[in-house]
Amino acid sequence: MTCGSYCGGRAFSCISACGPRPGRCCITAAPYRGISCYRGLTGGFGSHSVCGGFRAGSCGRSFGYRSGGVCGPSPPCITTVSVNESLLTPLNLEIDPNAQCVKQEEKEQIKSLNSRFAAFIDKVRFLEQQNKLLETKLQFYQNRECCQSNLEPLFEGYIETLRREAECVEADSGRLASELNHVQEVLEGYKKKYEEEVSLRATAENEFVALKKDVDCAYLRKSDLEANVEALIQEIDFLRRLYEEEIRVLQSHISDTSVVVKLDNSRDLNMDCIIAEIKAQYDDIVTRSRAEAESWYRSKCEEMKATVIRHGETLRRTKEEINELNRMIQRLTAEVENAKCQNSKLEAAVAQSEQQGEAALSDARCKLAELEGALQKAKQDMACLIREYQEVMNSKLGLDIEIATYRRLLEGEEQRLCEGVGSVNVCVSSSRGGVVCGDLCASTTAPVVSTRVSSVPSNSNVVVGTTNACAPSARVGVCGGSCKRC
């Protein structure tokens, strides 16, 4: 990589060398300490450019060559190199016509390298900004992940509470179901009792109907007997009147005959006594039958009334108990329905909460996976950026090594120039407005100094170019082909 350049414009590199423009007086002696410059030139130095450039000039018949320090003030005393005046006479030397093209190519190459270096620097800055941005995002995602991780125990606690409530509701529903079964059993017992009472009432009603039939039959018999008694009484009355009439008729006949016949009739029939006795017997029978029938009817009626009252009271109590049981059944049914509704609501709430919890957990897992993917991608991007940064730093390190190598070469050259040690090759050309071109190469071999002096007529400038080169063969050549050693 070539790091020396002749700057016709404003270009920068790791080590910028300033070259004169053709046709202009561009080199004068400037006895500054620490920094030497070429007046009238345009150009500059890079990040690690040479702080003290070469200074050369002509003063009268002597030629001075001085070298400034590198990245610091130059030594206070630099010995001048005296050049033989005869060497300044113009020589007819051929100049390579391709030197300008080579210089232009080198200039463009240095510009492109400077542009690449600036692009690398911008890229490094951009990558640093991206690295900071990714670190901020990573910290934000980590904090966000920590914040989201607190939701899972909350959902678990809420779900556990709902499960406990569901278990309590299930226990209450079991208890209510057992109570409902007990009440249904009691209801079945009361239903059986009610059916038994209904059957007993039906039996009592049947007995009452049978007794009523018997009473009716007895009443009919009583009526028949009363009718018979009336008929017998009428018959007795008829017979009595008949006998009385017969007796009256007989007495009238007897009175007409006026014969008194006294007969001792022991067979005297006392009909009145007989009739009275029969009547008394019938009256006694009727009275006794009536009394017995009335007493039996009254007893049966009282018994039936007591039975009806008893069964009515039992039926009323049974109806009240049935109504009470119906109300209790309705109340328990309402409670069971309410418990079932509450249980279904709680189950729906538990299912909804579980679904919401699962949805939240799945969403959290998805977000966590997205964040992990983003984090992994950020890590990969960071790794790529770090790798590119390492590549850029390696390039920068190589450039720094080259700069340090060139600095050491320049320091060694200045030291040799100050001590007067080292091989100096002076080539003189008589071209007008000649430009010195130097190719600089980095190598591990010892530097060799090659100096070319281009001499022009008295109205032209004197340019002294010093080139440090480290070729693999430890040789130094001056561009342009003006020296046979190149």
UniProtKB/Swiss-Prot annotation:
Membrane-traversing stretches: none
Subunit structure comment from the entry: Heterotetramer of two type I and two type II keratins.
Name of the featured protein: Keratin, type II cuticular Hb6
Start and end residues of each stretch annotated as Linker 1: 142-151
More details: There are two types of hair/microfibrillar keratin, I (acidic) and II (neutral to basic).
One of the protein's GO biological processes: intermediate filament organization
UniProt cross-references to SMART domains, sorted A to Z: Filament
Record PROSITE patterns: IF_ROD_1 (PS00226), IF_ROD_2 (PS51842)
One Gene Ontology term of the molecular function aspect: structural constituent of skin epidermis
Keywords, alphabetical: Coiled coil, Disease variant, Intermediate filament, Isopeptide bond, Keratin, Ubl conjugation
Tissue expression pattern: Synthesis begins slightly higher in the hair shaft than HB1 and HB3 and continues much farther up, ending in the keratogeneous zone.
Region (Head), start-end ranges: 1-106
Positions of the UniProt region annotated as Coil 1A: 107-141
Pfam families (UniProt xref): Filament, Keratin_2_head
Region entry Linker 12, spans: 253-269
Source species: Homo sapiens
Region of interest (Tail), ranges: 414-486
Region (Coil 1B): 152-252
Sequence ranges assigned to domain IF rod in this UniProt record: 106-417
Database matches in Gene3D superfamilies: 1.20.5.170, Single helix bin (1.20.5.500), Vasodilator-stimulated phosphoprotein (1.20.5.1160)
Coil 2, as annotated region: 270-413
Covalent cross-link Glycyl lysine isopeptide (Lys-Gly) (interchain with G-Cter in SUMO1) as placed by the record, residue numbers: 212
